[in-house]
Amino acid sequence: MEPAPLVRPRSYVVRGRKTDAQQRAIAEFWPAFGVDFAGGLLDLDALFGRTAPRTVEIGFGNGENLLALAERHPERDFLGVEVHGAGVGRVFAAMRERGLSNIRVIRHDAVEVFETGLSAGSVAEALLFFPDPWPKARHHRRRLVQPDVVRLLARALAADGVLRLATDWEPYADHMLAVLDAEPVLVNVAGPGAFIPRPEARPVTKFERRGEKLGHSIFDLEYRPLP
């Protein structure tokens, strides 16, 4: 019996325009720091030119979190996966300004990257912060946090790895909690049915500030592989 096909939510809509500066940054930095992903297994040691703990951020948006963490942890490597060109250009421009070299960027669907590009146990930390909540009921199937996707994320985590998530949309937070708690190979660090306190180490980004301005609570989740 063949396995059921993977359910791939189309969790994004490509929008926004790159500024001239962002376009120039992409043209200048893509050869060194961009990854032309075509579906094959990635050689992370070759991409980064070293062996180090790897953090993968899914949908890094304008790159605030990715850049802050890369600057704070030069001993780690950071792989950002984003479909929007404006965010990619902003990250490259900021890398130039800050002198960062420990970031690589893939402009591709994150589900496919985790499915075919990342080997089992290759990721020390996976981050999914403030993904599109798709609040309308008819769009819930487009939410990125779905059982099949969670299994892919769990597979990529190292034995001592960690999956961190955050959202300011309470119904999506409850959905995340239910899906992740149901994954048998992951353990909720806060305990079943619970969220963790906001980690001080997580940089504050515009998405969090916007949520708080709207009066939304912030929900953080943290999962580790089952020992």
Swiss-Prot record:
Coiled coil: none annotated. The keyword Endoplasmic reticulum does not apply. Keywords: Methyltransferase, S-adenosyl-L-methionine, Transferase, tRNA processing. It catalyses: guanosine(46) in tRNA + S-adenosyl-L-methionine = N(7)-methylguanosine(46) in tRNA + S-adenosyl-L-homocysteine. Pfam families: Methyltransf_4 (PF02390). GO terms for cellular component: tRNA methyltransferase complex. GO terms for molecular function: tRNA (guanine(46)-N7)-methyltransferase activity. Substrate binds at K136, D168, T205, K206, F207, E208. It comes from the Bacteria. Gene3D superfamilies: Vaccinia Virus protein VP39. Its EC number is 2.1.1.33. Pathway: tRNA modification; N(7)-methylguanine-tRNA biosynthesis. S-adenosyl-L-methionine binds at E57, E82, D109, D132. The active site is at D132. Catalyzes the formation of N(7)-methylguanine at position 46 (m7G46) in tRNA. Belongs to the class I-like SAM-binding methyltransferase superfamily. TrmB family. This is tRNA (guanine-N(7)-)-methyltransferase. It comes from Leifsonia xyli subsp. xyli (strain CTCB07). The lineage of its organism: Bacteria, Bacillati, Actinomycetota, Actinomycetes, Micrococcales.
